[in-house]
Amino acid sequence: MSPQGGRSRAWWFIDTEAKGVNDHSRQRIVPLPEASAVLQGTSPAPQDSFRAGGADVVDPPPWAHEIIQGGMGAGVSGWKLARAVSLTGHLGVVSGLGLDVMVTRQLQRGDPTGDYRRALAHFPIPHIAQQVIDRYFVEGGISDGAPFRAVPQLVVHPSRESARLAVVTNFAEIFLAKEGHDGSIGVNYLEKTQMATPAVVYGAMLAGVDYVLMGAGVPAEIPRLLDAFACGSEGELTLAVQGCDAATAPSVSFSPESILGDAPPLPRPRFLAIVSSTMLATYLSREDRTRPDGFVVEGITAGGHSAPPRGRLRLEADG
């Protein structure tokens, strides 16, 4: 997103460190030619952040963060880590994968700190949050070795219970990450888990998430989904189904009215697409309906969901 507020260009965040439990992802904003060179492996990822000067280096937009904490997986990049990073002035990121399972299991463990019940108490439709508590909360926790109560499986046309659970649990995680401060919080989802995406994204937006990050696929429809939810409208996502083209592929949708009745407008989070190929980044940048506000570029050192090698094999002295 440009400093003027439009999505006429996308900003590039170069991921210069492998993402692991004990490190973070350090980013630098760069122009398209330099980011493209990193993606193609013809230039190393820069090791500094926001270096000023030089005709080819742009000033960071006002909303940029020097450090974007990586989404490192379910139960690792949780609300406590994201909140701690945000309190230092950087962008804390919650891993949104499987939050319905993570939150409901914590409730079944008795929610000993009371954090999730406190978050659910702030859900805008109290009786929906109470339904989740009634179904999953176990006072004192389940016995050792006892099985957890399962959550509904993902399907193309989820039940009302399933959709509401996705919204409520994502709301709770983002609420806790943002509680008590005005720092920025992002949530990381996977394009591959498409059947969950509309409902979980809406739940995060309902809690005021500031950024949505997504990779592991081609997240071309996410900007349009965010636009729809920000207006209180139904959001729809075309499913990638082998053997189907755009005209015949099924879609999954979510209507905010199914949760809130008369759904109010919501602040639209910025969208950062995670890419590891110039081809994908160029495709997403072509039209406003697919263009993200920025890219997180996973180069050869990023250690993320890097795409398979493309193009002609090139070998150098080091391999």
Question: Where are each of the predicted segments found?
Answer:
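Intrinsically disordered, low-complexity polyampholyte segments enriched for Lys and acidic residues
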Residues: 15-23, 34, 48
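Active-site entrance/lid segments in N-terminal catalytic domains of soluble metabolic enzymes
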Residues: 28-30, 35, 46-319
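Short linear sequence motifs
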Residues: 17, 32, 36-43
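Residue-identity detector for glycine
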Residues: 5-6, 20, 41, 53-54
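Low-complexity, intrinsically disordered or signal/transmembrane-proximal segments
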Residues: 4, 24-27, 40, 47
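Tryptophan (W) side chains
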Residues: 11-12
